[in-house]
């Protein structure tokens, strides 16, 4: 829908595919202010494995004395716009050199859905192998999300992972020759050659565990249709809070270490887009009553033509923190140290204190550069016009932020930190302090729950759970100095604990409602508002799924 104020023909919409011009849609007099549907052919020669469609609006509303920032210059592209593609699937060779493609494609922004196939209800070691693989794929999927449907002796209609041993294998692998070592092989789906299966093969379940660790730690060496894992050796143990996705808390961190893509700390334009930096912090970082967090910020920017109100605004989690002026001349009274550098950019250095109490597990630091751009004026007979130029802003890679002066403390149980950060299990990124308790003969739903939980933790830490422990014997957890993750029923060794029994039964049967309820999650009610007002008891015929946190009876911490 084009603005009714546009000049016909002179105003147009340019369509690019991968920065190649595909066509121009001129705005005609009949289209002004009306919804328009137009078709534009796309040249398939310019389509690659990663594509970007860009729309560029060229708008004019006056022949002379035009204000390029006028609010009458607009064109709306509807959400119902779409690409209509006709394509033919091609058979892909069984080559692991591109692994994890096709099972996971980093260019696909959709949630990862990767089925896992077992010959039947898996034993504990086979579940541990699958959990490691799920956590590794979860670490790759990250913010996209992940789902691992479970199949017993069935074939899905999409790429999948298969676990098999010489003695126990799905029926569709009954003719596969036995293996002599932990083996990872890519094969065609017997029902569809365009679908691939990644078969994790072994002589027994211990081989499957070794192969799973090989995927998590040695996949960069994969090539050919199959590989064997000869051995894995730990050279250096992991340390607490060293998850790759978390900001380091043992020293100051440069902004270069926080970048997730090149050019992230740069922006250009008449009004440059905001520069954002993600800060994923351990949820138990103790910031209460702290004065703040030190950030040494270095930035460069195009000099404003005159001294005006151009500024840089700093926000944390969409909450405004502080503003700094963008100066056009030397001024020793300002907080910014300006040094002339290349192409008319100014160099600034400021120290900022971030209010610590606003920090959570996942934070976004945003820098908005607001320029006051002079606009043309005059009359039709005496018009003043000029061509606006782009402004360039850069946050220095050597800017630093320091979280090393704080302790680690948190009151548990707290299911929020489990949902948002996989904590406390993610304290050790490889889950070496975690013991998972699973049923002896799990159902598909219970295995899927295990894989979903481990995949979620992997997405938070950025590392596979290669050192987690797992058992199907509830008696083995007694006096264990570990974080326990229970899948399915509560082990009999814990059923004698009255606190746990009361907690589980309460979750099933009754709920308390507070005096005052707030719909906004950002509002944390005080003690008076959280005081229970009513208690309701319910008996239901349907099953219920729940996540429950409680203190281990075997450890006070």
Regions found by a protein language model. Give the residues of each.
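Solvent-exposed alpha-helical segments and adjacent loops
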Residues: 1-557
């Amino acid at each position: 829908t084009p603005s009714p104020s546009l000049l016909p023909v002179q105003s147009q919409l340019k369509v690019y595919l991968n920065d190649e011009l595909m066509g121009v849609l001129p705005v005609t007099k009949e289209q002004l202010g009306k919804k328009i549907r137009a078709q534009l052919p796309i040249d398939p020669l310019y389509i690659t494995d990663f594509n970007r469609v860009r729309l560029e609006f060229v708008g004019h509303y006056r022949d002379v004395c035009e204000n390029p920032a006028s609010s009458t210059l607009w064109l709306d592209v509807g959400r119902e716009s779409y690409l209509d593609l006709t394509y033919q699937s091609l058979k892909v060779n069984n080559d692991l050199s591109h692994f994890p493609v096709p099972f996971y494609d980093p260019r696909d922004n959709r949630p990862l859905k990767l089925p896992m196939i077992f010959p039947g209800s898996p034993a504990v070691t086979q579940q541990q192998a699958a959990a490691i693989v799920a956590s590794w794929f979860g670490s790759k999927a990250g913010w996209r999300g992940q789902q691992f449907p479970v199949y017993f002796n069935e074939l899905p209609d999409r790429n999948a992972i298969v676990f098999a041993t010489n003695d126990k294998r799905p029926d569709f692998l009954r003719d596969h020759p036995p293996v002599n070592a932990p083996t990872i092989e890519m094969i065609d789906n017997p029902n569809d050659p365009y679908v691939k299966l990644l078969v994790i093969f072994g002589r027994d379940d211990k081989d499957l565990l070794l192969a799973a660790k090989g995927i998590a730690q040695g996949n960069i060496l994969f090539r050919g249709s199959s590989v064997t894992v000869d051995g894995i050796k730990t050279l250096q143990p992991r340390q607490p809070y060293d998850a790759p996705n978390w900001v380091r808390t043992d020293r100051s961190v440069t902004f270069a270490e926080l970048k997730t893509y090149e050019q992230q700390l740069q922006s250009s334009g008449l009004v440059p887009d905001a520069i954002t930096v993600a800060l994923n912090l351990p949820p138990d970082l103790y910031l209460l009553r702290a004065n703040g967090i030190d950030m040494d910020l270095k930035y460069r920017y195009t000099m404003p033509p005159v001294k005006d109100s151009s500024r840089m605004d700093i926000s944390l989690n969409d909450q405004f923190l502080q503003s700094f002026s963008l100066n056009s001349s030397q001024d020793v009274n300002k907080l910014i140290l300006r040094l002339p550098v290349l192409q008319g950019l100014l160099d600034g250095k400021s120290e900022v204190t971030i209010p610590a109490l606003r920090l959570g597990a996942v934070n976004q630091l945003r820098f908005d550069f607001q320029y006051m751009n002079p606009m043309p004026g005059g009359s039709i007979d005496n018009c003043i016009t000029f061509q606006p130029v782009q402004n360039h802003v850069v946050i220095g890679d050597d800017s630093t932020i320091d979280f090393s002066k704080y302790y680690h403390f948190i009151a548990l149980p707290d299911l929020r930190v489990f949902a948002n950060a996989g904590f406390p299990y993610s304290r050790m990124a490889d889950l070496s302090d975690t013991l998972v308790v699973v049923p002896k003969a799990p159902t598909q739903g219970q295995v899927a729950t295990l894989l979903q939980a481990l995949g979620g933790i992997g997405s938070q830490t950025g590392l596979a759970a290669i050192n987690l422990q797992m058992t199907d014997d509830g008696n083995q957890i007694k006096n264990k100095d570990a974080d326990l993750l229970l899948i399915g029923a509560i082990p009999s060794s814990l059923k004698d604990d009255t606190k746990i029994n009361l907690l589980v039964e309460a979750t099933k049967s009754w709920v308390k409602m507070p005096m005052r309820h707030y719909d906004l999650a950002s509002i944390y009610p005080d003690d008076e508002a959280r005081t229970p007002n009513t208690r309701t008891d319910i008996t239901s015929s349907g099953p219920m799924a729940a996540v429950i946190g409680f203190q281990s009876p075997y450890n006070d911490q």
